[in-house]
Amino acid sequence: MQRVFCCLLFCESITMSTFSNTSSKLLMAIGAMVGVVLASNYLVQFPVDLVIAGFNLADLFTWGAFTYPIAFLVTDITNRRFGPGQARIVVLAGFALAVVLSLWLATPRIAVASGTAFLIAQLLDVSLFNRLRYSKTWWKAPVVSSVTASVLDTALFFTLAFAASLVVLGPNDDFAIEAAPLFALGFEAPRWMSWALGDLAVKVLAVALLLVPYRLLIGFIREAGSQRPDEAAV
């Protein structure tokens, strides 16, 4: 955890110097994004070592599943406040800084898998959110964009990070590729597939739970009199 703290401090100094001409609120979004990705890349290496009602959660979840969904909240709030162009800046800045620093916190294979999945999924989230941003239903844009991007992110990350056939990207994780009951359903599959399903389940649940802070923050933005951002072409 000390390494995480050191990385976050280093990240903050880089972010402030690199984006000195950007608004402080956008800098906060960039810092939040980098922090979420760094924490998730570190925590995804650790299964949840608990047994509840006979279910070994180590076969279902890693700790990273509980932090990463916050990245979609950061993206959607930035998109709503500043527009898709600035949201993409946050995604790209978060991607560049977090992947480089993740090489210290995690294995190179985890960093590559995380960076690839993060960049593609977050840019998809920005595009989908922007298409739906003025829907009459306030929750439609964050739910549709975040759930769709979560499916893509989960599929890309866990395949690249743990699939035995992709050993060219880095050494296999023996515990991850070991056969285990698929999401506690009875038939066996590599353990990382259960992690992927568990990760996706947590992300979808988090999308619903994070609607509360999303709604509160959007209300705060409106009360502050922020202007409606231009709809950019996707």
What do these predicted regions represent?
Residues 37-45, 101-105, 161, 214:
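Structural signal for membrane-spanning alpha-helices in multi-pass inner-membrane proteins
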Residues 16-85:
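Hydrophobic transmembrane alpha-helices
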Residues 6-7, 11:
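Cysteine-centered motifs
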Residues 34-37, 72, 94-98, 150:
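Residue-level recognition of pore/gate-forming positions within transmembrane alpha-helices
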Residues 111-230:
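Membrane-embedded alpha-helical hairpins and interfacial helices in multi-pass inner-membrane proteins
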Residues 98-117:
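Interfacial aromatic-anchored transmembrane helix boundaries in multi-pass membrane proteins
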